[in-house]
Amino acid sequence: MDMKHVKYLALVLCIGNLSPVMAQTASKSLTVDNLVALQRISGQAISDNGKWVACKMEPWEGDAVVNLYDAQGKELATFPRADRFLFSASSDYLVVSQKPGKMIVDSLKIKKTKKEKMPMDALVIYSLSGGREVIDSLKTFRLAEKADWVAFQKGRKDSTLYVQPLNANLSTRYEAPAVKAFNFAEKSGMLYYITAGDKAEEKPGLYLLNTETGVKTLIKEGDGVFKQVTFDEDGANLAFLYCAQKDSCYKAMSLWLSQQGAPATEVAARGNRAFPKGWVISEHGKLQFSKSASRLFFGTSPEPRQKDTLQLAENRPNVQVWSWDEPVQYTVQDYNKEKELKRSYQAVYHINGGRICQLADEELSQILLGDEGDAPLALLSTSRPYSLSSMWEGRTRSDYYTVSLEDGSRKLLASADYGRYRLSPQGKYAYWYAETDSCWYTLSMADGKKNQLTTPASFLAWDEENDVPDYPNAHGTAGWTERDESLLIYDRYDIWKFDPDAMKEPVNLTMNGRKNRISYRLVKLDKEERMIDLNKPQLLKGFNEVTKGNGYYKARLSTAASPKELMAGNYMLRSISKAKNTDHVIYTMESFEQYPDLHYATLDFKKSIRLTHGIDQQKDYLWGTAELVSWISLDGRKLEGVVYKPADFDPAKKYPMIVSFYERNSETLFNYRMPEPHRSTIDYHLYNSNGYIVFNPDIRYVDGYPGESCYNCLMPGVAMLIGKGYIDEKAIGAQGHSWGGYQVAYLATRTDLFAAIESGAPVVNMFSAYGGIRWGSGLARSFQYEHTQSRLGGTPWSTPLRYLENSALFTMDKVQTPVLIMHNDADGHVPWYQGIEYFVAMKRLGKPCWMLNYTGEPHWPTKIANKIDFQKRMFQFFNHYLKKEAMPGWMSDGVPAVEQPYELGY
């Protein structure tokens, strides 16, 4: 038995209860239309008691279905056309909303059916002990997180709110008329709702309903504007903003507070002495109670300016004035304009003392609260003085201050610091990674003492594989232990414990990660857990850099010890969730050949049950395999990559090959690569199934020479595969998008090896791209050439040759390869004029080239019809040049503008 089959057998034994589809004889090749219909897992949930699991399966186009399973893996129920799904707090019910069928909706749209005549959603309340209730004509619903109650509205024109227990005991159902908004408290069955009232019984205003007692309380009467209605965690206190005059809310919002279900009282309003002069309560500022509910945080702002209604808009010039020395690029200002108009500055109301303290302002606008708002000090910061340099650095410096929540007094901690300060859970320390020296630091919030936790000589905190002309990033942190006693920091492989006061030596808690080249990372199973309990066993996920496989490990981090392997192998583990009250978990396991089906187990992973059977979708189709390969680059570096071979691979045959890549992807060897009509890349399964080999090589870069780095890494990898004898060297294509699109465009100027290239959203002119704008954020593009992905390490005037040598445009006359470009006119990442420069140059040179522009789409197609179209055209393009299939009409004759609304040219 060869090693390929040994590995496959080991995988099957590891996974356990697998469907035998992989052993079945498949005969059909995938089509693009098949990709659209194949289902993926788009959601999953486990009940708090660990007895039930729900999983949502969804095609890329069409209706989703939610399946319900018990602890033995038996499918109990199926809910077609499913959307949202939630288990109740008691684990006795599953609540599922259902949408109308897509085919029905589409047919009604074709008939131009009016909106009020279109079908509505439904709500299914399914009892896990048997029985179900269906609520038709659903408009919206909320399920209480900590109580078995649901609130909903139904009917397009009816705004009645219905609140009922999930047991369908309608004798305890409540109704409220003309409801505008409603929600449950996070950890109780308390519900608020805002109603316009009716003439009979219900006055307009804000009400509180205690579902446990049935008591309804009018918290605030009024038909004005209610905003930011917020419970504390337990639902005992309720805060909100209110404005009686709807047309003056921008300046007349007031803050109200209800305690223990009592009618609300106004606690802050315009003109409060604690506010800066001319400031008001912001309707956009988020309300937030501290954990103890002793503090209420809210937002203030300068009174918003109002437009001059006496001046006609047509009489006002619509000019933008860009200034060379303004800190924030005008395009960024314009992009963020609506956000800035809604900006608020945090203040706090001390509930017990009835005092207000303004914490943030226009000079120091960013704030971090410690201990969920209960710490005595918060962290204030601003990057405004340094915004200009971030335009080309890609990073920003900040000033940091402590601020007292009692009196608002401030103390400077650091100026012009590149570190991104964060707060420990209880707010005792600020901590950060300093990119400039690759070290971790803490700072005591109480006395301002700064401590250096790591040095480059003692701890490799940084990304050891950094290959951009900038400071390397950190590997991050696992979190803080209880009482802020220790900070757990990752290096490339292990988890280390550090004393935040730097009085004790650091401890490598996992010990063997670097030795075994396994990268250990803590798995957070409890979303509500703020700190790490070192005395409890912890689940770690490990990535093996040698095999590229994953594993789960058990560790007690109270002492240094090698983690205990629970399961590990040649697969990828993802999407783990734990039941709240038991040690049951659900997770997915996958490889390129193995669908990421959902599994159910306990935390020891001794027995795992496969719940879903998504792999059954593969049984009729030819499915490829993935293999790790290695070679030496032209500049002497060992590289890895993945070769994806057809299911019926025969080493004696010659296969067409597509090289598809970005930067480094060998670590995704066991990624299933869910079949789909991708927005930017080929679908590996589609091409494997149709007789293509796909090669995804790792690229490692030298500063200043990204194009040549790509050439030096990729070409010997391709040569290595050609040398194996099964590649048709006259039928090799290349495909990449964005950064990958740039690289394949560059390669076409350096070699005529490729018979066809698809280049998506490429940069071909580094000079003009440097001066462009990322319209999706307003940012200038200069930083990415000087410091990040484009890797030129200088400006066009300091290193002009680098810009020239790395720009495909200036050697386009050397291109001998037909090119398909995809670049959309609403691209917010790469200016689409780059695609135009590429196309115009190729057209001028008389070289075969086609360009796809999905009008109104961003960096890649997002509309499903456009993604399908892109995949079909790219598939036809490669099939023509690599498999000698007939040229489709859109390539041979084009699609003239006057024909475009009617013809696709397939």
Model features per residue range: what roles?
Residues 1-27, 763, 772:
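Bacterial Sec-dependent N-terminal signal peptides
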Residues 16, 23-584, 590-596, 600-601, ...:
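Beta-propeller folds
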Residues 221-222, 310-311, 359-362, 393, ...:
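Composition- and surface-driven signal marking solvent-exposed, interaction-prone regions
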Residues 294, 656, 755:
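Conserved acidic residues
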Residues 357, 379, 599, 629, ...:
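Hydrophobic/aromatic beta-strand patches that form the interior of the parallel beta-sheet core
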Residues 383, 543, 590, 660-664, ...:
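Glycine-rich His-Gly loop
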Residues 456-468, 605, 613-731, 735-737:
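Cap/lid segment of the alpha/beta-hydrolase catalytic domain
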Residues 674-906:
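Active-site-proximal cap/loop segments of hydrolase catalytic domains
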